[in-house]
């Protein structure tokens, strides 16, 4: 990746919006020309104006050093300028809640910087895999040794999500080339299946052997039979996002473009919709507990919620860091809910115990954000990531 373009990409991930101040210029000072020229070659300077920020040059340097290798002189110039003019936005600090549960967070920086590492999963052999969306690659990590290997995928694929099958093959959603792909790690060969949907997004395997996926921009859901390549795609409500299989085989779909959760019949591909209170509600990820209750993060409202499929009843709880906390990735482990507050800096990992209705939370060490998806390991631990700083992480729950 071109170094200057990578700086742009990395800085843009720290921002909330770039629409309001699209033509504003950066403050005067040493380093302005470098940062301004680089940014304007890719996007408006408003993206930096809306940065969450850091108050020291060392913190800024730590962030972009996980994304790109610069000379000492370049790094010092950029870091000092950003620290002076874009200090920490302190209102975005998380409200961390103390508790009795102990965890250990281990993070690894992936080899190719600027790739936007995300969506780690555990393969049947215990290895950890991730997707490098911007670099069109996937990678394998040995959690015992820290050894990593990356595999190049078709250059236009920009894989959004990966999912392993029982044989250890790695399936991915080709978000930019309208494909579902499969990597055979033993040979490095890739098989692609073309989709009508332009942007396959998230995916999961069903006990029936089929792979089901969402396509956010295309507003479609799909089913692929890996045995024969048969592919069925259907239209759905706006911006389908996360997808999970429930205990009874029903597939549950989160919607990021409407205030709904969908129950997808794996055989007929028909969807039953459940409306979440408040038209502003948006759901990115969800999970199922042992009783079939659907847990979700209400990103726009700063809440987590529970849907009872039998009654349609929905109950929600305020996330500790408030309405702007933006709950994102979510998983259920032993009927306890784990999710992140992606609107805070550092990104906060939150534990919610439904039995006691109590919260506990921790700052993710690399902290830039954003954990966009999580995975429960066979040992009952949690795989996380920080896409803005190319980190893959393991949360050991004691």
Each predicted region: which residue ranges?
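The canonical Cys-X-X-Cys-His
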Residues: 35-46, 78, 82
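Short loop/turn segments that connect beta-strands within beta-propeller blades
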Residues: 142-146, 184-188, 225-229, 265-269, ...
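Electrostatic cytochrome c docking/interface patches
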Residues: 18-34
């Amino acid at each position: 990746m071109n170094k200057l373009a990578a700086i742009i990409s990395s800085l843009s991930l720290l921002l909330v919006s770039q629409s309001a101040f699209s033509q504003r210029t950066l403050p005067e000072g040493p380093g302005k020309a470098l940062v301004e020229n680089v940014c304007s070659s890719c996007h408006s300077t408003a993206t930096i104006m809306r940065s969450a920020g850091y108050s020291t040059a060392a913190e800024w340097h730590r962030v972009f050093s996980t994304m790109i290798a610069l000379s000492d002189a370049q790094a010092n110039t950029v870091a000092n300028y950003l620290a002076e003019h874009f200090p920490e936005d302190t209102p975005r600090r998380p409200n961390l809640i103390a508790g009795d549960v102990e965890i250990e967070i281990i993070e690894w920086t992936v080899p190719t910087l600027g790739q936007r590492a995300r969506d780690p999963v555990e393969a049947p052999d215990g290895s950890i895999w991730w997707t490098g969306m911007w670099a069109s690659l996937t990678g394998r990590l040995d959690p015992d040794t820290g050894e990593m290997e990356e595999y190049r995928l078709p250059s236009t694929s920009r894989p959004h999500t990966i999912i392993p099958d029982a044989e250890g093959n790695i399936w991915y959603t080709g978000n930019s080339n309208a494909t579902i792909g499969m990597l055979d790690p033993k040979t490095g060969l890739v098989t692609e299946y073309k989709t009508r949907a332009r942007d396959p997004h998230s995916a999961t395997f069903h006990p029936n052997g089929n792979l089901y996926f969402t396509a956010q921009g295309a507003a479609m859901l799909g089913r692929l039979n890996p045995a024969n390549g048969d592919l069925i795609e259907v239209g759905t409500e706006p911006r389908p996002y996360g997808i999970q299989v429930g205990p009874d085989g029903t597939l549950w779909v989160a919607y990021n473009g409407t205030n709904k959760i969908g129950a997808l019949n794996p055989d007929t591909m028909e969807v039953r919709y459940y409306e979440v209170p408040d038209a502003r509600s948006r759901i990115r990820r969800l999970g199922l507990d042992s009783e079939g209750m659907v847990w979700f993060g209400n990103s726009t409202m700063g809440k987590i919620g529970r849907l009872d499929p039998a009654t349609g009843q929905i109950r929600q709880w305020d996330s500790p860091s408030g309405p702007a906390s933006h709950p994102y990735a979510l998983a259920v482990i032993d009927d306890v809910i784990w999710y992140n507050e992606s609107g805070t800096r550092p990104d906060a990992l939150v534990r919610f115990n439904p039995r006691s209705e109590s919260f506990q939370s921790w700052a993710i060490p690399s902290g830039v954000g954003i954990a966009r998806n999580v995975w429960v390991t066979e040992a009952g631990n949690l795989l996380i990531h920080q896409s803005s700083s190319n980190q893959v992480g393991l949360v050991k729950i004691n």
